[in-house]
């Protein structure tokens, strides 16, 4: 942990070494390792540039991802795979989706400004906070004025571009962000499917908070006869195969655990 903090650079080298060694000395289980910890940290500080240069040659260390993951990204995005992997190692910003039925992004930005919360518009309905906030402290969240949703994720509903009275299927809908975005964008009719009954309840909670309605069913989209009424859909939103590759900045263990 101390070495990670050294790399991060938020504290002075002296402070990190001193506090880490003192913490080891004050714990009966680690007191005997205090000298070793001190030696390792000081050597790292002396040789950090050489160590970093060696580690940067190993792609799995450089991008904090297994080689199979790196190969897959490289095959899918041959022209910018390094940038994609690099961004995956950074902390994700907090981005909000403004509920177009309740307020405009410009008006919401003014409200944030009045509260002393720095933010920037980064998409049609996307507002990025300069610093993350607990959900309970986000102005308008509880009232359904905004939702937390990455800017990239918001593109799904925008590209689908729902129209008035269209019948739309969201085939893998939990926790309901994309379903809600469709309904905020147009007076359409959405059928939201989720195979997990508990996650289907999350969709209902999301829609209730935002003041929009959809037909929510706990069902397997592949078992069409069990849920489909026979009415044709004008559009289908399918977020599959649900690899979680888009959330590695928030859950860095994803490449290692899947």
Regions found by a protein language model. Give the residues of each.
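S-adenosylmethionine
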Residues: 1-258
């Amino acid at each position: 942990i101390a070495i990670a903090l050294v790399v991060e650079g938020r504290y002075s080298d002296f402070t990190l070494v001193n506090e880490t060694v003192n913490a080891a000395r004050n714990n009966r289980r680690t007191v005997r390792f205090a000298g070793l910890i001190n030696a390792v940290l000081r050597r790292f500080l002396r040789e950090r540039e050489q160590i970093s240069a060696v580690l940067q040659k190993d792609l799995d260390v450089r991008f904090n991802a297994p080689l199979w993951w790196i190969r897959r990204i490289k095959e899918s995005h041959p022209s910018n795979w390094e940038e994609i992997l690099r961004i995956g190692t950074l902390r994700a910003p907090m981005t909000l989706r403004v509920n177009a039925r309740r307020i405009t992004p410009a008006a919401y930005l003014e409200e944030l400004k009045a509260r002393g919360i720095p933010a920037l518009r980064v998409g049609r309905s996307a507002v990025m906070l300069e610093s993350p906030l607990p959900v309970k402290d986000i102005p308008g969240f509880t009232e359904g004025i905004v939702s937390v949703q990455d800017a990239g994720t918001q593109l799904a509903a925008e590209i689908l571009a729902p129209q008035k009275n269209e019948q739309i299927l969201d085939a893998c809908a939990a926790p309901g962000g994309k379903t809600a975005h469709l309904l905020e964008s147009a007076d359409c009719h959405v059928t939201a499917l989720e195979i997990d009954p508990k996650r289907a309840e999350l969709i209902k909670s999301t829609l209730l908070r935002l003041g929009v309605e959809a037909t929510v069913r706990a069902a397997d989209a592949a078992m069409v006869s069990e849920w489909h009424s026979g009415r044709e859909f004008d559009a289908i939103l399918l977020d599959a195969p649900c690899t979680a590759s888009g959330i590695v900045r928030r859950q860095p263990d994803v490449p290692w655990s899947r």
